[in-house]
């Protein structure tokens, strides 16, 4: 027989096709294992890319063709600068007011609001206006509170020119009039306009309370010389940045979030690899006598190798294709969860369309096929190296597994040490950390065979005394088929350990956050403007409300806070700043580092001696402890501020700078108040005070008055909602593991049909057969569950102490609950028992004569 390419050797392919028709269920399991793993990766990619594209489109609608823009502090840019630029011949400049509003008349959703000068727009955002005759939009310039929308949005909500639209701008209710409809030239422009309201610059200044100020000035600069000349004319506190700066900043904000989701989906794929390995191994083991006959007839080792590899390649292609389709479908469902999390923690975004990129599909295709080939390689090599005589012996593979035991311990030590080294390496590289995490997980999975053998051999005598011969047979059967059972146990262990690890890490985060909220938010009443999303307030409190509430009877102290973003030149990005008039924790705030005496910290802080940094800020900027003074761009130029302390904070993974309000007002000329924290006098009742304030401000939509307890509950609700995706990933990994156990038990059932047929022939009842199967599956599930507990704890420690710190900069306290461990054991045992029901049913219905007949 000639050694020819496997694809050209028709008889071998006919045997493979007959095998597929005889045992379709095994190949279905193989395809499912690949499909589910690929689906999760593609789903995460699709949902993340859709959110990123939605932001890119909304940013492009604002940015247009501008190459640079001039920006300043929280109060914006003085519009006189725009006038001066025009006077000096810089015609490629345009004023912009930009912000988010809650469009109550447009589905009660957050939308971008842009104020522009239509006469300066042609060079910047012409695609939005290309099909529009500005002369027909006279009301755009002359009508008070006149706005324009895309024709598609207006039709969706049944609006016509002249209709009024209710908005909430910076927390204050207002009404605008639709004075015109935009008809974009193409679909991309239409998508850009789907979440955009446009008004004249003067209308926007009035609505956003920015008289004489601009959010930024857009520029089109074609050479460096022009950029240099403009920069030389800029007043103190104004800077020039490229138009891509905001997009890059946003991408950096969400990178850690996306990487963490992708890593969790890879764990589901890792469980799928175990399933593929288990299924292919069984296919090889079951066909060993047939392969021996083929080898005797002259089929070469290489032909057997390529037959097995190509079978898996075909299954991998089918599974990957199915996984891509499922992933796109799941991605559509995950978009809402991903978008909500981004809205809660980062920025406002609305995703209208699913974005499926070629890169996402190619990534899923490569990963799926690579996973299938990687998992198939060991059994294919084993089949290739086995000589015909040993191939005919059923015990040869199991004897090899027994000889392999010491080497599995060596591999466990080597791979585990490599993983620990990767985790130990300093730096904030998440990819290195996840390589270490996966190395440790695979190392722990490698010891499943020796541990299973060790435990089962010691359980057999005890179970024999307790349950009789069947109790002794069950653990011994697991050991006799260790090449299949140990892989199924490892797959289930990986899935359940993911459940334990993520549950502990999420529980630790939740408990740490709850404790932090309890000690940090010590005020009795919280006053704020309404929010666009579940995140921080979008506007500021009315001046009259601040004045009246701070003097309200029963209020001992009113701490005022102002949230804003300022530019840090040394870090090249805007940072979040919170200016406060006092300590909202009433002296209970936890600190990571303090300069000097803690008792004098707040007196020094309120005297303007320095600022405080949150722990994530220190981590994100890789600052040394103690941190050096930081530089911030103020209205009068860059100013340096000493750092007095580093405090614990879980409100933002981007970091927060805490500054006293007096210093903030002096440097940025900003008297606005975003929120108020009210401390009541002794004997005052918070419920009664809230009722009084709500009655006094009844009918006003620009003030929200609630107890601090309600704020804590809302924070915990947002936290729980943000981890919904994680729970979904856990579920998929468990489903894949369930399929793996089912595959292993089906393999054992087919492989042991002759043996069990003999047992039935000598008197074993169907009831005893069911009992044997359930003891075996229960032992496998229990073993997987017991191994998953320490593995899950190790995974949780890595997630909490390393991955979390590198991703978000938060230090969390490990928190263990017995419920996590009990639930994991229950899931492992129940999954194994459930997977054993179908094989037990099949065995119970088998014909004894057929089962005991040898070929």
UniProtKB/Swiss-Prot annotation:
Keyword Cell membrane set for record: yes
Induction: Highly up-regulated during the early stages of invasion of the human blood-brain barrier.
Subunit details: The complex is probably composed of two ATP-binding proteins (Rv0986) and two transmembrane proteins (Rv0987).
Keyword S-adenosyl-L-methionine tagged: no
Family label: Belongs to the ABC-4 integral membrane protein family.
Protein name as catalogued: Uncharacterized ABC transporter permease protein Rv0987
Biological role stated in the UniProt entry: Probably part of an ABC transporter complex involved in host cell binding either through secretion of an adherence factor or through maintaining the architecture and integrity of the mycobacterial cell envelope. Could be required for host endothelial-cell invasion and/or intracellular survival.
Deleted gene: phenotype: Disruption of the gene reduces the ability of M.tuberculosis to bind to host cells. Disruption does not reduce virulence in a mouse model of infection. Invasion of the infant human brain microvascular endothelial-cell monolayer is significantly decreased in transposon mutant.
Signal sequence interval, chain numbering: none
Recorded GO MF terms: transmembrane transporter activity
UniProt membrane topology term: Multi-pass membrane protein
Parts of the chain that traverse the membrane: 24-44, 256-276, 318-338, 361-381, 404-424, 430-450, 487-507, 725-745, 780-800, 821-841
Keywords per UniProt: Cell membrane, Membrane, Transmembrane, Transmembrane helix, Transport
Database matches in Pfam families: FtsX, MacB_PCD
Main location: membrane
Location within or outside the cell: Cell membrane
InterPro entries for the chain: ABC3_permease_C, MacB_PCD, Membrane_comp_ABC_pdt
Classification via PANTHER family: BLL1001 PROTEIN (PTHR30287:SF2), MEMBRANE COMPONENT OF PREDICTED ABC SUPERFAMILY METABOLITE UPTAKE TRANSPORTER (PTHR30287)
Listed GO CC annotations: plasma membrane
